[in-house]
Curated annotation (Swiss-Prot):
Residues carrying sugar: N3, N8
Disulfide linkage: C101-C187
Segments on the Extracellular face: 1-30, 93-101, 169-193, 292-309
Principal location listed in the UniProt entry: membrane
Record-stated family: Belongs to the G-protein coupled receptor 1 family.
GO biological process: adenylate cyclase-activating adrenergic receptor signaling pathway; positive regulation of MAPK cascade
Gene3D superfamilies per the UniProt record, alphabetical: Rhodopsin 7-helix transmembrane proteins
Membrane-spanning parts: 31-54, 66-92, 102-124, 144-168, 194-219, 265-291, 310-334
Organism of origin: Xenopus laevis
Cytoplasmic side: 55-65, 125-143, 220-264, 335-465
Protein name: D(1C) dopamine receptor
Length: 465
């Protein structure tokens, strides 16, 4: 009877171990599937960006797109040189690649840093294009862009391969703890405090402060221009009819909606970046101090963060590389290139009015961004500046085209482009975007009102990025 009881206990323990093993196997299979989907989406998105620029010359002609390409290359490196090795480790439960560990750690630091620094460069490029568009047009050449990109990649290499190959990054306490343990099965980077803080400052904290500052300034500039345009619209409405109270209310509501749209887009750009990377870099600076032994303490303190929690936040940071193509390279030009590459021209919608997206545009634009009013004819139409042809604007308009001349001399445009049936059209920007922010020049607003229309041969519009 006693032997039978022992047999039952043994069988029950065996079944329990089998259930645990099946559960662990299912969890690893699910983890492998999710990580594989993340890697494939990162590869697909960033490969499409690179192919689009290689295939379409007009995308290579814009200096701004050089920064987007550099970002896509760094994210591709994350998907090729970093993610797969860690995914295999997560599924297997241990590091299976032996002495490749140090090289992998260096690739991880280099690619992640390059991706973040490229995001910082894009924010600076946008700010300069918006704050000083005419100077940006002159100064931001291909040579300057390549220098900025080169600095970002050089800095990424300097803080990754040199310290890792010289073992400056390792924690001596972690090395002592690993004595007697097979190092080839554990690829724990265990950074020392000095390297953890200095690398985190360069890789994340300084860039994120710069990005917050630049995008805050971009929002304030956009807000100012929205309100100026709103005041012009109210002036036009007041010139047409005496009852201006209703028009003022509508104009204020429109202005508020535009400001909200700009703020929402910028919040998503910064929110996604901070959400993905901030938890990892907080832990990255905190963990080296958690392993510090107090004086007189015989046993080391337990780690303040579990390995599972840390790995989850590592993958959160890498997931940012899969989102960057959607945020920074999904504007009208790139979308058309993507549909051509994927061969879905026949099935994809080609509506001229773009929906709100979170690409290079601050707020997605309409292909016709001209605010047009019909007013009874009270003066000569020839005093109007030439109106931009819609097809011309479609060709010129995508992300951050800096400053473009949108119209030429009166003799180069036919009168039919004015579309003036029984009234006069006035050209005044109604949409604040990173494409066209304002009809204002350095000397003041362009004359959108009938009483102020001047006979000028050239009409400049400031374009954002």
């Amino acid at each position: 009877m006693e032997n039978f009881s022992i047999f039952n206990v043994t069988v029950n323990v065996w079944h329990a171990d089998l259930d645990v093993g099946n559960s662990d196997l299912s969890l690893r299979a699910l983890t492998g599937l999710l990580l594989s989907l993340l890697i494939l989406s990162t590869l697909l998105g960033n490969t499409l960006v690179c192919l689009a620029v290689i295939k379409f010359r007009h995308l290579r002609s814009k200096v701004t797109n050089f920064f987007v390409i550099s970002l896509a290359v760094s994210d591709l490196f994350v998907a090729l040189l970093v993610m797969p090795w860690k995914a295999v480790t997560e599924v297997a439960g241990f590091w299976v690649f032996g002495d490749f560990c140090d090289t992998w750690v260096a690739f991880d630091i280099m690619c992640s840093t390059a991706s973040i620094l490229n995001l910082c460069i894009i924010s600076l490029d946008r700010y300069w294009a918006i704050a000083s568009p005419f100077r940006y047009e002159r100064k931001m050449t291909q040579r300057v862009a390549f220098i900025m990109i080169g600095v970002a990649w050089t800095l990424s290499i300097l803080i990754s391969f040199i310290p890792v190959q010289l073992s400056w990054h390792k924690s001596h306490e972690a090395d002592e703890e690993l004595n007697g343990v097979n190092h080839t099965e554990n690829c724990d980077s265990s950074l020392n405090r000095t390297y953890a803080i200095s690398s985190s400052l360069i890789s994340f904290y300084i860039p994120v402060v710069i990005m917050i500052g630049t995008y805050t300034r971009i929002y304030r500039i956009a807000q100012t221009q929205i309100r100026r345009i709103s005041s012009l619209e109210r002036a036009v409405e007041h010139a047409q009819r005496c009852s201006s109270r209703l028009s003022n209310e509508n104009s204020l509501k429109t202005s508020f909606r535009k400001e909200t749209k700009v703020l929402k887009t910028l919040s998503i750009i910064m929110g996604v970046f901070v959400f993905c990377w901030l938890p990892f870099f907080v832990l990255n600076c905190m963990i080296p101090f958690c392993h510090m032994n107090l004086p007189g303490q015989n046993e080391p303190e337990p780690p303040c963060v579990s390995e599972t929690t840390f790995n989850i936040f590592v993958w959160f940071g890498w997931a940012n590389s899969s989102l960057n193509p959607v945020i920074y390279a999904f504007n009208a030009d790139f979308r058309k290139a993507f549909t051509t590459i994927l061969g879905c021209n026949r099935f994809c919608s080609s509506n001229n009015v773009e929906a709100v997206n979170f690409s290079n545009e601050l707020v997605s634009y309409h292909h016709d961004t001209t605010f047009q009013k019909d007013i009874p004819v009270t003066f000569n139409n020839s005093h109007l500046p030439n109106v931009v042809d819609q097809d011309q604007e479609v060709l010129e308009g995508t992300c951050f085209d800096k400053v473009s001349v949108l119209s030429t001399s009166h003799g180069t445009r036919s009168q039919k482009n004015l579309h003036l049936p029984a009234g006069v059209q006035f050209e005044c920007e109604a949409e604040i975007t990173l494409e066209t922010i304002t009809p204002f020049t350095s000397t003041g607003p362009l004359e959108c009102l009938p009483q102020l229309v001047a006979d000028e041969d050239r009409h400049y519009t400031t374009k954002l990025y």
